[in-house]
Regions:
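Active-site entrance/lid segments in N-terminal catalytic domains of soluble metabolic enzymes
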Residues: 1-177
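Electropositive, surface-exposed helix/loop patches at the edges of structured domains
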Residues: 70-97, 183-192, 242-256
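Conserved active-site-proximal phosphate/metal-binding subdomains
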Residues: 161-183, 189-333
Length: 333
């Protein structure tokens, strides 16, 4: 029987990875996804209730969350390391050291070069998945020794590069560019997206926004309800100084884009972003006047289930769709 490469690499039952989300994916969500057979991932500021610039405190909070996940499940899980640049790298270095000390099974590395922490993590026996946005970056990650790459299309929520390659185009490009396993994300919320991803050459899927709207998610109830109410054209791409972000359309995005259009200086734009950042939405419940990262799949989200039920329902539906697709393929025989 042919084994799925991501399942074999990570020791999981289903090739479904819950993407790390800032202020959202804490121990409860991570453990729930891992326990049901996928791979949960602790995101930045997991378990935090306020913004804390202290590096040591940030590292210790990550350690506490790792311990909490292990108290809830014995299944493999991942922790996100956002490499960053310049002064911000002091945070990622601390998180990386905690991962090594705690012998975390998997690290999902993003927002930075793949050669920064890969060697150290792998020497500690940690599997490394690196997030990229182009085939060229995927090749560089492979050369740096990562175990798998994660490609995210233009549909994806949150921060990404300035390229506008959609998941449908990016996935086969990356699959052709590297020999290591490929996980794809951006616009995937249900069994249809997973089926498409596998057909495009991916070994697994990376789902964020759909898991944001689950009971275990640390996202504020106001934000969850905003995503449930979201209609078809509900997100917008927001250009920032160093990268793009895809956000749920609200008063925040309208005002920010108006400031950009008016020619506001970079300092003013950055101050506005800081004053209306995701923390205000995810923990204070300001679903209108703060930034909410979201994929275009928000228009497909209609309920707030437990993460376990979500995964189980996706797998059950996926089996039906595989059978239906096999029937449809008979026309090509």
């Amino acid at each position: 029987m042919t084994q799925n490469r991501i399942c074999s690499l990570l020791g999981i039952r289903y090739p479904i990875i819950q993407a790390p989300m800032n202020w959202v994916s804490g121990a409860a969500l991570t453990a729930a996804v891992s326990a049901v057979g996928g791979m949960g991932t602790l995101g930045p500021n997991a378990g935090a209730v306020k913004i804390n610039p202290d590096v040591e405190a940030t590292g210790e909070l990550a350690r506490q969350q790792i311990h909490k996940v292990r108290s809830l499940t014995d299944k493999p899980f991942a922790v996100n390391v956002t490499v960053g640049f310049g002064e911000d790298m002091k945070y990622s270095k601390k998180i990386m050291n905690v991962l090594v000390e705690e012998k975390v099974p998997v690290a999902i590395v993003s927002v930075g070069r793949p050669d920064v922490y890969t060697e150290t993590l792998k020497k500690a026996g940690i599997k490394v998945l690196h997030a990229i946005s182009t085939p060229r970056h995927a090749q560089k990650a492979q050369e740096a020794g990562v175990d798998a790459v994660i490609c995210e299309g233009f549909e994806a929520g949150g921060h990404k590069g300035f390229t506008e390659l959609t998941t449908f185009v990016l996935t086969p490009m990356v699959a052709d560019a590297v020999d290591i396993p490929v996980v794809t994300g951006g616009g995937i919320a249900d069994s249809r997206g997973i089926l498409a991803a596998l057909a495009l050459g991916a070994d697994g899927v990376y789902m964020g926004s759909r898991f944001m709207v689950t009971r275990e998610s640390e996202s504020h109830e106001n934000v969850k309800q905003a995503l449930v109410r979201a209609e078809d054209v509900c997100t917008v791409s927001v250009p920032k100084e160093f990268m793009l972000a895809r956000d749920l359309q609200n008063t925040f995005t309208e005002k920010f884009l108006e400031l950009q259009k008016s020619g506001a200086p970079t300092e003013q734009l950055n101050n506005y972003l800081e004053e209306h950042g995701p923390y205000r939405a995810q923990h204070l419940g300001e679903a209108e006047d703060a930034e909410i990262h979201s994929s275009q799949v928000a228009g497909l989200i209609n309920d707030i289930p437990p993460a376990t039920e979500l995964v189980e329902s996706i797998i059950a539906d996926l089996k039906k769709r595989f059978a239906a697709l096999e029937e449809q393929m008979s026309v090509f025989a």
